[in-house]
Design a protein with these regions (language model features):
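Short arginine-rich
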Residues: 56-67
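A broad, structure-centric signal for solvent-exposed, well-ordered loop/edge residues
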Residues: 21-23, 35, 51
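Compositionally biased, intrinsically disordered low-complexity segments
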Residues: 16-17, 40, 65
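Short N-terminal "domain-start" leader segments
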Residues: 1-25
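Acidic helix/loop or adjacent segment enriched in Glu/Asp that either coordinates divalent metal
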Residues: 46, 50-58
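A short, exposed loop/beta-hairpin motif centered on an aromatic-Gly-Thr core
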Residues: 35-49
């Protein structure tokens, strides 16, 4: 595990960033950073779909950073 790594410093946010029919995207933020460190390339029809994909991306990021 990386030194000073805390998974609780990373948060998933789903935001309305475009016009319908696919307005939703997920973004991952790190504590202390103003801009997202990752975001979805694709937009989603529903907030729920973006949230589900974002949770998977956050899990993968945390797994990668914790090695």
């Amino acid at each position: 595990m990386r030194r000073n790594f805390d998974p609780d410093d990373y948060a998933l946010v789903v935001k309305l960033r475009a016009d319908p029919p696919r307005p939703w995207r997920w973004e991952i933020y790190c504590a202390g950073k103003r801009l997202p460190i990752e975001h979805s390339e694709a937009f989603f029809e529903t907030r729920g779909a973006a949230n589900k994909a974002g949770k998977q991306a956050l899990s993968q990021l945390i797994a990668k950073l914790s090695v």
